[in-house]
Amino acid sequence: MTDITQKMNELSVQDGGSGAGNSPGAGNGPSGGNGSRRSQYVPPHLRNRNTSSGSGFGGNGGGRGRGSFGGSNYNNAGNRDNTIFGGSGRSRDRGFGGRGGFRSNQSRPGVGRWVDGKHEPSARNERIELELFGTAEDTSFQSSGINFDNYDDIPVEASGDGVPDPITSFTAPPLDELLVENITMSRFTKPTPVQKYSVPIVAGGRDLMACAQTGSGKTGGFLFPVLSESYINGPAPIAESTGAFSSHKVHPTILVMAPTRELVSQIYDEAKKFAYRSWVKPAVVYGGADIGQQIRNLDKGCDLLVATPGRLKDLLERGRVSLANIKYLVLDEADRMLDMGFEPQIRHIVQECDMPDVQDRQTLMFSATFPTDIQMLARDFLKDYIFLSVGRVGSTSENITQKILYVEDEEKKSVLLDLLSAGDAGLTIIFTETKRMADNLADFLYDQGFPATAIHGDRSQYEREKALAAFKSGAAPILVATAVAARGLDIPNVAHVINYDLPSDIDDYVHRIGRTGRAGNVGIATAFFNRNNKNVVKGLIDLLSEANQEVPDFLAKIGRESAFGGKTGGMRGGRGGSRGPVRDFRRGASGGSSGGWGNSSGSAGGWGAAPSGGNSYNSGYSSRSNSYNSSYGSSGYGNPTSTNSWW
């Protein structure tokens, strides 16, 4: 069987023509070579540009190559092709098309069945396993890093009645045997702290609200337990549907909502791995792609639906999805969904459609931060839940080496070239504040001999997916991005994150640099700072101190000046949030005794009962949050998050 890396490399760059003129020019930048080598990846926005010289990667023949990145599982409309879990023909049989989907006269490879109250996994399929899990030598299928064992020392705080003891390994029981096999094929060797607690919490029928640092395994934290319980207990019976589209309506058992197209696609990819050979058929829907194709994919069967709120609302209104059988509701990156203005859609989906009541389903909320308004959402959506805080919520990982450089705006490009020239050949993400700057910087780097591509909200879905695929494969190892790629994306082996433009909000800085140092790996985060960024000085100093990083003298000096002038800040003030250690708002001053901190390998301390009043919502937050919010407000800064930058 050919190594999947070789297959991807063969597909990654299609030659734009013949002859040496379409090959990388020898000595032209880091990717120089002779005329027999393949052409370099060309970003989508540059493919139709005509150049008069052989600069960049055009070689002696001049002009940029027009090869396009291939090997993606997206069709020409930019939609995910559900090839593994697809099918044809119409049926209500769960073992084939399933749950309002299409029929096949024989079982599809990689898809199991639920028959007569029993789970019947399908036979193993070598081709599918290579596609889903890759090979052990392929670093793009990385599951853990050299510092993974350090997660055992991360403190874990769990509050609520009857907190179960954490698991210490992936075993059956408590997990289903098939899921353990899929986890093993994914080369996960041990659970992260959030996974150690989420598995027994969900197995015990409890709701969960989890805060964990970025890169801590939140996706597995909800996929592992809900899939395991689904394999053990099976689907809910399908009620008879009525209406014009009743025969085409799907009835998923699991619903996962997340804010962006990239994040739901990533969750879907992970779900395919862990649902392999099971009766659970994953599907994904999101805006910006052909809804007709997504409906056709749904009709092939859908038991686990991953969706953005806007597209899901559309499908519900069209009568193509029923939520009546939902057993598990997952809200991932809940704070970002509210930042993007999705709260009305989320409340409509959860409270006004046919989803079972909070008492008749299990609900899990995951995110890196949980300000007050998110905790209020939890009060409405969750019942008798356990609040889980892993590590210092809202802080950065010590696996990331942070470097703050003082660079004036006009010197940024020169310093960036020095950094890229001196660094090792690893994947690098460069963040800018505007879409125009992202395109400008990608063009500049390309002209200087660095294969770069850009991703932001103005790119079509097809272009975005092609650019991400090129970046992950190394065909274009430099990705210039706006905030569209800053949250949730789990791209293995990102060695360096560069904040070319610092964000106005320190939380956004945290999530940007969290693209490196994931799953216990080490990474470097470099930020270009000057006096135009004074609004985040206080937050930067606190983050560096918390993560045991060096605070540059110039930053400390500007921090003292800003503090004296009363204009520090950079925190998101409009939402009443806090970046201090998040605590369960139910543990107010008027009720509930608090226990101690546990660690990820032991049981949690014994927490008292949650207060019955629950009125003192802010009492659990650190006092410094108030000074952050007031400073932010007095500086005259509004909410820096723009929905348009994400879409």
From Swiss-Prot:
Residue ranges occupied by any Helicase ATP-binding domain in the UniProt entry: 199-388
Annotated compartments: Cytoplasm
Disordered, as annotated region: 1-122, 566-647
Coiled coil: none
Official protein name in the record: ATP-dependent RNA helicase DED1
Function (record text): ATP-binding RNA helicase involved in translation initiation. Remodels RNA in response to ADP and ATP concentrations by facilitating disruption, but also formation of RNA duplexes.
Reactions mediated catalytically: ATP + H2O = ADP + phosphate + H(+)
Entry comment, domain topic: The Q motif is unique to and characteristic of the DEAD box family of RNA helicases and controls ATP binding and hydrolysis.
Biased amino acid composition, Low complexity: 609-647
Residue span of motif Q motif: 168-196
Family: Belongs to the DEAD box helicase family. DDX3/DED1 subfamily.
Residue interval(s) of motif DEAD box: 332-335
Domain Helicase C-terminal per the UniProt entry, residue ranges: 399-559
Biased composition (Gly residues): 16-35, 55-70, 566-579, 589-608
Record key words, sorted: ATP-binding, Cytoplasm, Helicase, Hydrolase, Initiation factor, Nucleotide-binding, Protein biosynthesis, RNA-binding
